[in-house]
A protein has these predicted regions:
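Phosphate-binding P-loop
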Residues: 19-25
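Short beta-strand-centered segment that lines the nucleotide-binding/catalytic pocket of NTP-utilizing
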Residues: 51-66
């Protein structure tokens, strides 16, 4: 499904709609250029779970926000040029049953966690604040997913 947003607050609201449909063991993969809105979308997702103060974990790779469920925000950008074992060594799969994951730059790594995930690609739109999102539901868990 393709979605267009024209402002930062629309991206945040879209994230909240996505987040309202998530449950433990769900994984959302975000791909897009730097500054495309991945973190804003993540902030919206987290807001639907009652979380605030979400920042990009670029330099620390991941942030675990404890709760029921846990919310794990991963920025895998720094791992893109490394081996897959560097991602698996971080042992995220042990958190999967009780956590919701959002993984920026996660396409090369998602298969180590699950074969069912929501894949969102974000591209620049026609103006500075507009973005186009291509949302692909992968696996049976996501059948019937709609926004």
């Amino acid at each position: 499904m393709k979605i267009s947003v024209n402002a930062v607050d629309q991206m945040h609201q879209l994230g909240a709609k996505i987040g309202a449909q998530l449950k433990p063991s769900d994984v959302v993969v975000l791909t897009g250029d730097l500054g495309s809105g991945k973190t804003v979308l993540t902030q919206g997702i987290a807001s639907s779970l009652g979380l605030s103060d979400i920042t990009s974990p670029t330099f620390v790779i991941s942030r675990i926000h404890k709760g029921t469920p846990n919310f794990i925000h991963i920025d895998a950008y720094r791992l893109l040029d490394s081996s897959l074992s560097n991602f698996t060594d971080l042992d995220f799969e042990s958190y999967l049953p009780n956590s919701i994951f959002v993984i920026e730059w996660g396409a090369p790594f998602v298969a180590t966690l699950t074969d069912q995930y929501l894949d969102i690609k974000i591209t620049q739109g026609e103006n500075e604040n507009s973005r186009s999102l291509e949302v692909t539901a992968v696996g049976q868990r996501w059948q019937g997913f709609n926004l």
